[in-house]
Every structure is written in structure tokens, then in C-alpha cells.
Curated annotation (Swiss-Prot):
Designated gene of the protein: xseB
Name listed for the protein in its UniProt record: Exodeoxyribonuclease 7 small subunit
Domain of life per record: Bacteria
Pfam family, one: Exonuc_VII_S
Organism the protein comes from: Pectobacterium carotovorum subsp. carotovorum (strain PC1)
Annotated EC: 3.1.11.6
Length: 82
């Protein structure tokens, strides 16, 4: 079966979904296979969130650069980090 192409979601949506996954896992009521699937999805969301935070930090660093004459250029994230 081909892998689903996932649409990019906001950081806040990812965090909300991750919190729901943690709650379901902590309940201890999921069968093992379901728990592993939830855990895998949670890891993916956590990595995506971490990447978005790193990109935001890079943008802030560019904006707060000590060199006032430095040209501002559009930030282009490196999507290979995942």
C-alpha cells in the first residue's frame, strides 16, 4: 500500500495531537499494536515540531543579527532535516 502524503500542519496542531497521543498511551488501555502505532506517530510529530522550532530559532537569529547592514533575505528552511 503506498504511503500517504501528509499535508503540513501547524506547530500548534502537531503539539495538540502529540498531547492526545501521550494521554492515550498513558491510559494503558491500548492493545500493543495500537500503542506502537501511536508511539511511532508521536515520534514523527515530535521530530516535525523540533524541526519547526529550529527553523523559527534560525529566523529569529537572522532578524536579530548584530550587523545592521546585513541584507535581509528570505528564510528558506532545509527540508532534509527530517
Amino acid at each position: 500500500m503506498p504511503k500517504k502524503t501528509e499535508q503540513p500542519v501547524s506547530f500548534e496542531s502537531s503539539l495538540n495531537e502529540l498531547e492526545k497521543i501521550v494521554t492515550r498511551l498513558e491510559s494503558g488501555e491500548l492493545p500493543l499494536d495500537d500503542a506502537l502505532n501511536e508511539f511511532e506517530h508521536g515520534i514523527q510529530l515530535a521530530r516535525q515540531g523540533q524541526q519547526k522550532l529550529q527553523q523559527a530559532e534560525q529566523r529569529v537569529q537572522i532578524l536579530l543579527s548584530d550587523d545592521p547592514d546585513a541584507p535581509l533575505s528570505p528564510f528558506t528552511p532545509d527540508n532534509d532535516a527530517l
